[in-house]
Amino acid sequence: AITVSSSLFDLMSKRAPETMLRRPLSAYALKSVIDQRKEEGKPRLTFAHVFPHSMHAMELRYWLAAAGIDPSCDIDLVVIPPSLMVDALASGQIDGYCVGEPWNNAAVVAGIGRTVITSGEIWSNGPEKVLAVRKDWASENNDIHLELLRALSETSAWIDDMDNRMTVAQAISTPDYVNAPFDEVVGSLTGKNRQTGGELRIDMPDFNVFHRYAANFPWRSHAKWILSQMIRWGEAPDSVDVEHVAKSSFRPDIYCEAVRPLGVACPKSDEKMEGTHSHAWLLTEASRPVAMGPDCFMDGRVFDP
């Protein structure tokens, strides 16, 4: 999700109050603040993400650009580890950030930040974390690789059961993992995370999707979208062979080989149109029909791989 400081949130609300009442919340109010600061000769705002080549960085850039903000020159972008984001916001080192939970929720609970948009609102059911291994390791350890994928699939299915979320929250809130208060961790896992204004939202059951909607399937259309954004922002050359990179890095054939013994349904196609579904839908072109969630982008664009 993207969180801004409480002071910046107040400025956005004053500059463009009408845009702050609609979800998904666009960055037009932020653009108004940025334009005003330019006129007044004030320094650029600073936003943080966790790593240059990350979904968080791409989501932040996408959200900004959709409102006409050029993330390359209208603001300053910096890299900060997730666990240090809240302190950086509190100290004024940064004005906002894009990061995973519980670091958005933590800022809201502390009263220093407001979450303006979630990753799922920028791109519904877009990819987030991946399991990636070296090609040579996969070749040399095929059986282990397949078992690892099966274990991940079964674990994801278990975590996706809302009845197990409290147990997960208790486990990962400990010092050995996230090392954050249970109350800050449990919100996003149960779809009741705090958002703008610090109010409790109870209508985000798909805030975290671990297994349903073919969430573990490595869609090559996801890979191509990621590559398109890397090219867009100069992180990959225009000459990159998108088709080759997508096929060599995202391997649905290996995934399906691994999960087939578990009875997990697999799509028959390796890619799909992204952004064409605003509501739940049924994928029939699969080993058996798969209930799917929305895949729309916040700006209504469609990505054709």
Residue positions per predicted region:
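Secondary-structure end/capping motifs
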Residues: 141-252
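A bilobed periplasmic-binding-protein/Venus flytrap-type ligand-binding module shared by bacterial periplasmic
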Residues: 2-11, 127-143, 158
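Inter-helical turn/loop segments and adjacent helix faces that build the functional surface
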Residues: 70-75, 139-145
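Conserved C-terminal helix/tail region of periplasmic/extracytoplasmic solute-binding proteins
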Residues: 224-305
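Hydrophobic residues within well-ordered alpha-helices
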Residues: 60, 88-90, 230
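Short, glycine-/small- and polar/acidic-enriched structural segments
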Residues: 1-73, 78, 95-108, 112-125, ...
